[in-house]
Each structure stands twice: as structure tokens, then as C-alpha cells.
Amino acid sequence: MTITIRNLVENDLEFLVEVRNECRHFLHNATEFSLEGCRDWFKRTNPRFYAIENNGIRIGYFRTSEWQQDSCWVGGDLHRNYRGKGLMKAAYFELFEKLKKLNVKTVFLSVLSFNEVAFNLYKRLGFQTLSITDVQQSGTNKLTNSIQMVKEL
């Protein structure tokens, strides 16, 4: 296993949409995204997203947002064929190293309470719960809890 992360580029968007839509029931926004809409969004916003690779094969991606002087929000999705193998944990360690080089000292994330696998991973990675709020998952009528977490790098 050799996990690397790199800047996500336009050629990665088809993969991103496939993985994101497959994982959408675990996300705060469960709306299905189109490739065309994703391309427009990517060109318009130039997001700081990262492709996750294992031995040169794309297996998932990280998204970052709300960058401040020394903090940002993070989240990630892994292709279903690569889950349950410890790859996301290793990928987060790579992401943390990259963020440290960018002078990020604090990372935040938000996870839906029913996503127990992700919540437990975040606890093992050293994230602490900041708050829990009631939310309606976009694209559904589902009411659930959103857990905001923080980690010092």
C-alpha cells in the first residue's frame, strides 16, 4: 500500500462525480450531481480538492473548504471497492502532512450521526466532538444529527 494525494484536476471529475454520488446518502447534501454541473462548478470555484491514490490508482478524494489563516474544513469519500481496508486512515495521515506544510494547524469536519464508520474513524484519528446540531439532509426529508469535530495537527 502506497497512499498519495495530489491536487484534483478536471480529468478527475468523472471519477469524483461517480464516487460522490455513490456516497451521497452519507453526505449533508444527498442531491445527485451531474458531470456537467460539476465541471461548471469546478471551473467557477477552483476548489482545493485532492485525489487519493493507492499505488497510482485513484481510490477517492478529499475536499477542503472554509480556509482561514491556519485552519480549514475537510471531508473525504472513498470508492466502495476500497472501503474497509484501512486506506482512508492512511490517506488522512497524508492529508494532514500536506496541510501542515500549508501552515494549517487546525482541521474541522462535520459528519452525520448515522455514519458510524466515518465517525469512529475520525475518533481514531484524534478528532474531538465540538457540537451536535439537528439538520435536514439536503435532497431528502431525513432529519438527523450533524456532529462537528476538530483536530489540532
Q: Predicted regions span which residues?
A:
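Terminal substrate-recognition subdomain of acyl/acetyltransferases
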Residues: 141-153
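Conserved acetyl-CoA-binding loop-helix of GNAT-fold acetyltransferases
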Residues: 78, 84-98, 120-124
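Acetyl-CoA-dependent GNAT
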Residues: 24-83, 98, 152
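Conserved acetyl-CoA-binding loop of GNAT-fold acetyltransferases
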Residues: 123-133
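Hydrophobic adenine-recognition pocket in adenosine-nucleotide-binding enzymes
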Residues: 8, 78, 111
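Conserved beta-strand-loop-alpha-helix junction that forms the acyl-donor binding cleft
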Residues: 109-119, 135-142
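Conserved GNAT acetyl-CoA-binding A-motif
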Residues: 99-110
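A short beta-loop-alpha structural element at the N-terminal edge
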Residues: 2-18
